């Protein structure tokens, strides 16, 4: 299937129409950003690696009954996906305290917690993707309570599957963010991507960061970290 009219460009991906109104082509770029776009750069072949990682993970989730927008990988950088209307929300799942939460509440990064923390942010670059709660989301018309409940239910299942998957390849899933959308049938689907761009992934033995924090924090060996994630996921499908 060939790319049609250009639809949209985000920080890490481009979207194109196809000859089917319900399908789009998602193109993965090498661009990298941090701090809501304040820091910009590129990671060599990041688009290729993130396309592969998302395809592997979304296929695994589909096999376990999670409905996603993913249809198939087309080539190194492109994948065919169902067209969805995205909820303007980021759903954040925290299994260990890290990143912005550590700073926000004054708890040391790496602190283990007895429960899983779910957060939502309003996806809006102008306002810095602010943290909101369910009542804000409903009042702002971003989602209904029923939609949020379904989203949280799906997210919990995704977290359990991802934790097990990464644990089996020697990686701790610290936290991650995901997005959801509705297709033409009105079904709520997991959308966007699940990659080292959107997850915090720490090596179980060494604690080494295998994610975009290497870019955010100028830790170096960024491409190597992404390659390692691809390698482990590919070796143990």
Curated annotation (Swiss-Prot):
Enzyme superclass (EC): ligase
CDD domains: SAICAR_synt_PurC
Reactions performed catalytically: 5-amino-1-(5-phospho-D-ribosyl)imidazole-4-carboxylate + L-aspartate + ATP = (2S)-2-[5-amino-1-(5-phospho-beta-D-ribosyl)imidazole-4-carboxamido]succinate + ADP + phosphate + 2 H(+)
Any one Pfam family match given in the protein's UniProt record, by short name: SAICAR_synt
Superkingdom of source: Bacteria
Disulfide bonds: none
ATP-binding is among the record's keywords: yes
InterPro entries: SAICAR_synt/ADE2_N (IPR028923), SAICAR_synt_PurC (IPR033934), SAICAR_synth (IPR001636), SAICAR_synthetase (IPR050089), SAICAR_synthetase_CS (IPR018236)
Keyword Ligase carried by entry: yes
Record key words, sorted: ATP-binding, Ligase, Nucleotide-binding, Purine biosynthesis
GO molecular function: ATP binding; phosphoribosylaminoimidazolesuccinocarboxamide synthase activity
Entry's EC annotation: 6.3.2.6
Any one Gene Ontology BP term: 'de novo' IMP biosynthetic process
Family: Belongs to the SAICAR synthetase family.
Record NCBIfam families: purC
Full protein name: Phosphoribosylaminoimidazole-succinocarboxamide synthase
The organism's taxonomic lineage, starting at the top: Bacteria, Fusobacteriati, Fusobacteriota, Fusobacteriia, Fusobacteriales
Gene: purC
């Amino acid at each position: 299937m060939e790319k049609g009219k250009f639809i949209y460009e985000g920080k890490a991906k481009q979207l194109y129409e196809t000859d089917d109104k319900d399908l789009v082509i998602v193109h993965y770029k090498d661009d990298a950003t941090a701090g809501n776009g304040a820091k910009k750069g590129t990671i060599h072949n990041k688009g290729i690696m993130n396309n592969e990682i998302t395809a592997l993970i979304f296929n695994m989730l589909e096999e376990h009954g999670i409905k996603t927008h993913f249809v198939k990988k087309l080539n190194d950088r492109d994948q065919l996906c169902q067209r969805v209307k995205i909820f303007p929300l980021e759903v954040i799942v925290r299994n260990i305290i890290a990143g912005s939460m550590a700073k926000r509440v004054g708890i040391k990064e790496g602190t283990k917690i007895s429960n899983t923390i779910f957060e939502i942010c309003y996806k809006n670059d102008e306002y810095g993707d602010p943290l909101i709660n369910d009542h804000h989301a409903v009042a702002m018309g971003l989602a209904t309570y029923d939609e949020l409940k379904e989203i949280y239910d799906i997210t919990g299942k995704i977290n359990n599957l991802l934790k097990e998957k990464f644990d089996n390849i020697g990686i701790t899933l610290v936290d991650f963010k995901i997005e959801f959308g509705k297709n033409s049938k009105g079904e709520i689907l997991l959308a966007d991507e699940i990659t080292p761009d959107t997850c915090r992934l720490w090596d179980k033995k060494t604690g080494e960061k295998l994610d975009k924090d290497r870019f955010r924090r100028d830790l170096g060996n960024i491409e190597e970290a992404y390659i390692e994630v691809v390698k482990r996921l590919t070796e143990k499908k």
